[in-house]
Design a protein with these regions (language model features):
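Expand to "…catalyze enediolate/carbanion chemistry for C-C bond making/breaking, isomerization
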Residues: 1-170
Length: 170
């Protein structure tokens, strides 16, 4: 038995080539339905709005046993507002309680870090905020120096402060 806070499953960047994404979704559904993770909160990192996979991810993975989603590449509060409403429609159509599925926005660009406070406030479904350092450094066209990571101190601290002031988990 694990002492993990949550189980995080992934259908985003770690699933390549893209033709494997359906296999990943099917595997997640099979493992959830088998009860493998029944004692845990389960979140799935899904593909972003512009990927072409978001709708498939959400419609197939809004099932009992999934508690929420990591919403990749969140840039603005509109991204979260859109995703919140998408979840609401699915919950309504499937007879789930509205608000069942939680959101963890992942901030991976300079714009998203600047917009962190409005993103945090965009939905009552938000339970935490994540910071994606690899994509953040790419967005800045920076040098990856994760050993010292001095260039990441400010955005990490900012995201943590925004999370705490909005009563979210950093």
């Amino acid at each position: 038995k694990s002492e993990a806070d949550i189980i995080l499953l992934d259908v985003e960047d770690s699933v390549l080539p893209a033709s494997n994404k359906q296999i990943a979704r099917d595997t997640i559904k099979k493992n959830i339905e088998s009860g493998l993770f029944k004692d845990y909160d389960v979140f799935v990192r899904i593909n972003d709005r512009e990927s072409g996979f978001l709708l498939q991810d959400v419609t197939q993975l809004c099932i009992d046993g999934i508690d929420g989603f990591l919403f990749s590449k969140t840039n603005t509060e509109e991204d979260i507002f859109f995703f919140d409403k998408l979840l609401e429609v699915i919950e309504y159509e499937r007879g789930f309680e509205i608000g069942k599925f939680k959101i963890i926005p992942i901030l991976e660009t300079a714009a998203s870090v600047i917009n962190a406070d409005s993103i945090a406030k965009a939905s009552s479904r938000n339970v935490a905020i994540g910071f994606g350092s690899e994509d953040f450094v790419s967005d800045l066209e920076g040098i990856r120096d994760f050993e010292e990571a001095q260039s990441l101190f400010m955005p990490r601290a900012w995201v943590a402060m925004v999370a705490r002031t909005n009563k979210l988990i950093p």
